[in-house]
Amino acid sequence: SKVDYFSSICYNVLGLIKIFERRGILRVKCFHLGAYGTNCFLAYDENNIAYFFDCGGHNLDKVYEFISEYNLDLKYIVLTHGHGDHIEGLNDLASHYPEAKVYIGEEDKDFLYNSELSLSDAIFGEFFKFKGEIHTVKEGDMVGDFKVIDTPGHTIGSKSFYYEKDKILISGDTLFRRSYGRYDLPTGSLEMLCHSLKKLSKLPDETVVYNGHTDNTTIGEERRFLERVGIL
């Protein structure tokens, strides 16, 4: 069933926070949100300009507290794709920060209004519909200082976001640690996913990969993995 896929990545860590610290211009914090513990990332620069990537649950109190404590200016709410475990808390977050703009890949926009695409009913038992304004992005666009990389396959509109100055990649459910996203859900494609993985493998080896459901990794590590399994 549809929900079987998501149960396979459920960490049962509802409400817990895991912090990843990196030296450099950008700092990245990981919050595990929703029933599946989706990795949702708060990134902020030296000027306290902040980005929030994916919003997998309603348990946002720790997010609000952190943003307030560090006096961050949340300007960008960014979705790597439109599956329910990445959008469940979107209405809550967007209403709490009405000045922040919400971004998603243009091909995945319909996921925010169609539960058959987002699988939100199977994931968290609700028919999700986004209530705010959405901004769509495509290959080569910039969201603040992050460059949009078109990485379809898990969904047709999956995007990754690359912060070149610090070599940080937000990969959503396209590339995991020693794994990659499923391609047999609505709009998914193995051919497109393989193309996307090959594209990401061309980034610098030292690029740190923050993904939707596993520990962070690097492009160099995952290039070697993809070579071993025959994708590269």
Features from the language model and the residues they span:
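Residue-level marker for buried hydrophobic side chains located in beta-strands
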Residues: 51, 78, 102, 147, ...
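Conserved beta-strand hairpin/beta-sheet module of binuclear metal-dependent hydrolase folds
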Residues: 24-70, 160-172
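Short, positively charged and aromatic/hydrophobic N-terminal segments
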Residues: 5, 11-12, 18
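Metallo-beta-lactamase
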Residues: 58, 119-120, 148-150, 155-232
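Active-site HxH/HxHxD metal-binding segment of metal-dependent hydrolases
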Residues: 58-60, 65-143, 224-228
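Short acidic-hydrophobic surface loop/beta-edge motif
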Residues: 20-21, 31, 43, 139-144
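Short Gly/Pro-enriched turn/cap motifs at secondary-structure boundaries
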Residues: 31-32, 132-134, 150-152
